[in-house]
Amino acid sequence: MHADPIYTLIIVLLILMIFIDTLMRRRRVAGIISLTSSSILILTIYNLLHHEFSDIIIAKGILLNSGLGFRFLTSNIIFFSLLTLLFILSRLRDPESSGFRLLTPSFVFIALSIISKTLLQNITLLSTGIFLSILYIIFEKSEDKGAIRRALLILGGSVVLILIGAGISLHYCPDLTISGFYLEGGFASFIATLFITIACLTLMGVPFWRNWLPTTRDTSGPLSTLIETMLFIVGASILISIGRAMERTSYIIIVASMIGTLPGAILVLREEKKNIITTMRGTLGAIAGVGVGLGYSATIRGAEIIVITGAVALLLMHIF
């Protein structure tokens, strides 16, 4: 890793966020580690272990895009050890938490994605895992059957906007090669737009969990921390790999994909008028996630500004 002052500042901000979160929200914090700061911090540590920003960092771990080398195995083991430690800490704080059981589908598909050798297959597996986890939790835990209707509205509205985004990206990304697997024409741009939108929806999904699950209405609860941290890491990972593949077209595609989050945000604001702060935090988390993905992919200039802006905004949200 290069000794870049910008990344040093990011790390300092993230560490500061943890202490601020612990001190200012002690009465409501069920665990020591904050969901957003911990997830970004884990990603930062993961990159420090690789000592390079010019390669596909997270893709070597969750989204396997290269050969199995010693450094890959070592850093990947440490990465998942840190993630497991986060789960254990939350579990100790609340022995009754069913976070492990609820997150089982995600773990299964992450494991499958590591075994898989094609980036497209990896993203497909991870995306499928995300949706299965969402459906599993809705049917398993939600007492409000209207949550299913809201989920379908969010996903349905997003699919329509995904198609619009694919049409826009078609003009900027006629062809795309992913890990040697060549995709032609509009199909390539559609696939890329689809999965970036899924990643953005994942990062923007924080407010929805709190509406669907009675156990996560306490936004600082262990189960909420587990779910949101996992979503943040998976969403940022997808953005990192796709950001690398899309290169110059990333700006256009991501802007189009972020449009897909509007139905969900509007729905939350309409049904939960007092939930504006929660929605803002979810939006800021998405901004930070996009910045992390693009910043670590080393393909988009100015991504560091997005990361810092998101980190500062999240820091302010923790204080107020």
What name fits each language-model region?
Residues 1-8, 18-101, 175-182:
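Transmembrane helix-loop-helix hairpins at membrane boundaries of multipass inner-membrane proteins
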Residues 2-5, 87-100, 221-227, 249, ...:
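Short, amphipathic, aromatic/basic-enriched membrane-interface segments that mark the entry/exit
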Residues 23-30, 101-188, 202, 267-320:
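Alpha-helical multi-pass transmembrane bundles of energy-transducing inner-membrane proteins
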Residues 13-18, 84-87, 103-111, 260-264, ...:
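Hydrophobic, membrane-inserted alpha-helices
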Residues 60-61, 67, 147, 190-252, ...:
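Short helix-boundary/re-entrant hairpin motifs in multi-pass inner-membrane proteins
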Residues 45-53, 168-174, 232-248, 290-300:
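Membrane-interface helix-cap regions at the ends of transmembrane helices
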Residues 2-12, 69-82, 119-129, 186-202, ...:
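Structural signature of hydrophobic alpha-helical transmembrane segments
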Residues 7-12, 94-106, 229-232, 254-256, ...:
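Short hydrophobic alpha-helical membrane-embedded segments
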